[in-house]
Amino acid sequence: MSNDALISALSHLVSEGRNPDTMDIDLLTSLEVVEKINQQDKQVPLAIEAELPQIAKAVDKIAQAFQNGGRLIYMGAGTSGRLGVLDASECPPTFGVSDKMVIGLIAGGPEAILKAKEGAEDSLTLGIEDLKAIQFSENDVVVGIAASGRTPYVIGALNYANQLGAVTVALSCNPDSPIAEIAQIAISPVVGPEALTGSTRLKSGTAQKLVLNMLTTASMIRIGKSYQNLMVDVKATNEKLVARAARIVIQATECEKALAVSTLKATDYDVKLSILMILTGLDLELAKAQLDKQNGFLRKAVENNQ
């Protein structure tokens, strides 16, 4: 795309427009500046609320993929790519899953997380190469993230995923964007022009992060990674998480701290097994068998053994 054509295309994007409420932001005090930004941020949850049915559709597809051994792949450039990497990296400690289950790919590779890699996002083939490098298949789900909705890196990847027969999801902050037209499921929270014109790390980035939170959290809940609203698959990999594991067991069972700690030690800090053993009186091997029988759904295992 020529420079003139790109300027024209960007001028029509909501996310690139000038915000009439912040035209004098350079004249304001620090308090007034942050008040202006805060006022703009309040629009984000409302924009996401309008997209909840689409988000739920994506959650169902992601959960189904997980249950069939598939993966969730985030793809984006710049801020969008970094947000995908961030959300993916939080899944192993939070839900006790492999770091291969949710993967964040960013245009330009890992180096681009810390420093922008010029030109990487403009390639229609680089996204395809990145998907091929992880053996992407029709069993996986790809979520293309781009505030503008027109990033070539994402467009190429979505087209490739469609050709394979995989589920494709687009997350953008502009209506009727190119990636929304390509993907099977389009999530488009339109948050309006940024407080600082074109700085889509602001409202657009916030909206993207909130949606990604929903996609992984809700899909993990759908495959049994919670009991009530407790993170029962959390991995106790440091002192804080060991303490959290004990607290979760106590909250779920109302047992004494000593029992929670001793049971956790007996299960090698497996929170699910510890809760099941305390609530049902099952020994370790029987608890494992019952949990496996219920495909890891702790609530079902508890209800069937009381």
From Swiss-Prot:
It catalyses: N-acetyl-D-muramate 6-phosphate + H2O = N-acetyl-D-glucosamine 6-phosphate + (R)-lactate. A lyase-type mechanism (elimination/hydration) is suggested for the cleavage of the lactyl ether bond of MurNAc 6-phosphate, with the formation of an alpha,beta-unsaturated aldehyde intermediate with (E)-stereochemistry, followed by the syn addition of water to give product. Specifically catalyzes the cleavage of the D-lactyl ether substituent of MurNAc 6-phosphate, producing GlcNAc 6-phosphate and D-lactate. Together with AnmK, is also required for the utilization of anhydro-N-acetylmuramic acid (anhMurNAc) either imported from the medium or derived from its own cell wall murein, and thus plays a role in cell wall recycling. Belongs to the GCKR-like family. MurNAc-6-P etherase subfamily. NCBIfam families: N-acetylmuramic acid 6-phosphate etherase, PRK05441.1, PRK12570.1. Homodimer. This is N-acetylmuramic acid 6-phosphate etherase. It comes from Vibrio atlanticus (strain LGP32).
